[in-house]
């Protein structure tokens, strides 16, 4: 039943009620019915993702840790596309960090980031942050802890110093709270990407040192057991130890070759300084905003070309990076020499064991030769006795049976013994028998 309008009176409402109850009013009402609002369109059916797509997406996502230069840290579960947008790297450079692909250790320098792939350390370093792949892995945890402990203590940089120097005091003049020594100390601090590279190489070298120390202790114990008892079990342990040393040597050699390649390539070394462009832009902005105050740094190539003094000159960056890589190159070379020493110790022990085995084999050959000579003498005596022991009947046999038999056996035995002595004498003079 239709309700009366709000602006009608009570009588009109009653008339409207009575009118609505008649059949004519029903027909009129059906004719003059106000059309209803159109229904909203149906939502398109949701796209159902199949199990295969969900599994593929879950397989492509990996755990990353983002750490900025201020010490801010967070865990991110993302795929390669997010990392590519975040770091500005192409997809082909991200394949280097894939653990499924067997790639040699590499340090790639790109326009906006540096890709570090050194054994278990897989990271992307930009001018302001570092992305570490699989930070919760057992071998990566020392590297992650080193980063988290270091960067909160090293959050002061030149930009903060310059900003603090331009704060005004109550009198409206520039504050001089920061001394020149503090500015110089901030300037001498390593760039962010160099510090991350330093920690990565340090973590890899510490892992190598720990591994070679464990292998050295294992080698001493295994080789001592081998010298006491040459058994199949001890020989298998030595073979396993040599295989581990070979794998470790190949790994150290690859990292050493990569560091040596960067040291020899000046262009690649220059491209590793990813923070210089960002710092150069910040210094340009600070110089425009505060032209009265500039940091006292001389011998800058950018200053000579543009008249703007920057934080760290490019020559100084290249020199610092060269010293850093050269130090780790020497350390890797020392680790490789330690591996060579352990391998040489194993080889020397194997040579000693081989000499002992050869001696045992010679003794066995001498014993075999002795048995052959003795068997030859016995065989001759047996052959002669068998040849003259035919059972031929003779009428005078019972008279002469005891006379020639003893002499014949004695003469035959003496002859065979003489042959054996002659053979032993020949073998002794020709050193065919061991002393």
Curated annotation (Swiss-Prot):
Keywords: Ion transport, Magnesium, Membrane, Transmembrane, Transmembrane helix, Transport. It is a multi-pass membrane protein. InterPro entries: MRS2-like. It is found in: Membrane. GO terms for cellular component: membrane. The chain crosses the membrane at residues 369-389, 408-428. Residues 20-54 are annotated as: Disordered. One of its GO terms (biological process) is magnesium ion transport. It holds the Pfam family MRS2-like. One of its GO terms (molecular function) is magnesium ion transmembrane transporter activity. Its main location: membrane. Belongs to the CorA metal ion transporter (MIT) (TC 1.A.35.5) family. This is Putative magnesium transporter MRS2-H. It comes from Oryza sativa subsp. japonica (Rice). The lineage of its organism: Eukaryota, Viridiplantae, Streptophyta, Embryophyta, Tracheophyta.
């Amino acid at each position: 039943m239709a309700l009366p309008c709000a602006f009608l009176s009570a009588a009109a409402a009653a008339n409207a009620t009575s009118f609505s109850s008649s059949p004519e009013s029903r027909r009129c009402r059906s004719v003059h019915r106000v059309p209803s609002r159109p229904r909203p369109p149906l939502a398109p059916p949701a796209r159902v993702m199949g199990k295969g797509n969900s599994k593929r997406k879950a397989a492509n996502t990996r755990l990353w840790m983002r750490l900025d230069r201020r010490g801010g840290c967070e865990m991110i579960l993302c795929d390669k596309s997010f990392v590519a947008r975040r770091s500005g790297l192409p997809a082909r450079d991200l394949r280097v960090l894939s653990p499924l692909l067997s790639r040699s250790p590499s340090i790639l320098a790109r326009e906006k980031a540096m890709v570090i792939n050194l054994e278990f350390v897989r990271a992307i370093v930009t001018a302001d942050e570092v992305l570490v792949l699989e930070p919760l892995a057992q071998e990566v945890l020392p590297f992650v802890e080193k980063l988290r402990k270091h960067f909160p203590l090293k959050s002061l940089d030149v930009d903060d110093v310059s900003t603090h120097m331009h704060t005004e005091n109550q009198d409206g003049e520039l504050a001089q709270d920061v001394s020149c020594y503090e500015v110089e100390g901030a300037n001498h601090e390593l760039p962010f990407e160099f510090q991350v590279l330093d920690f990565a190489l340090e973590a890899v070298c510490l892992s190598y040192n720990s591994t070679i120390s464990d292998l050295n202790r294992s080698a001493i114990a295994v080789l001592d057991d081998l010298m006491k008892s040459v058994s199949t079990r001890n020989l298998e342990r030595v073979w396993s130890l040599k295989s581990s040393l070979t794998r470790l040597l190949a790994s150290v050699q690859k990292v050493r070759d990569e560091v040596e390649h960067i040291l020899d390539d000046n262009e690649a070394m220059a491209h590793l300084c990813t923070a210089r462009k960002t710092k150069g832009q910040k210094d340009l902005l600070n110089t425009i905003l505060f032209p009265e105050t500039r940091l006292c740094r001389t011998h800058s190539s950018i200053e000579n070309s543009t008249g703007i003094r920057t934080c760290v000159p490019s020559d100084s960056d290249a020199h610092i990076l060269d010293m850093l890589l050269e130090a780790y190159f020497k350390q890797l070379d020392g680790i490789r020499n330690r591996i060579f020493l352990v391998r040489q110790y194993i080889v020397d022990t194997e040579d000693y064991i081989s000499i002992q085995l050869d001696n045992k084999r010679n003794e066995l050959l001498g014993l075999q030769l002795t048995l052959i000579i003795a068997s030859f003498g016995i065989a001759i005596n047996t052959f002669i006795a068998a040849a003259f022991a035919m059972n031929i009947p003779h009428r005078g046999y019972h008279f002469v049976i005891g006379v020639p038999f003893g002499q014949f056996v004695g003469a035959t035995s003496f002859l065979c013994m003489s042959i054996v002595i002659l053979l032993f004498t020949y073998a002794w003079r020709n050193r065919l028998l061991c002393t």
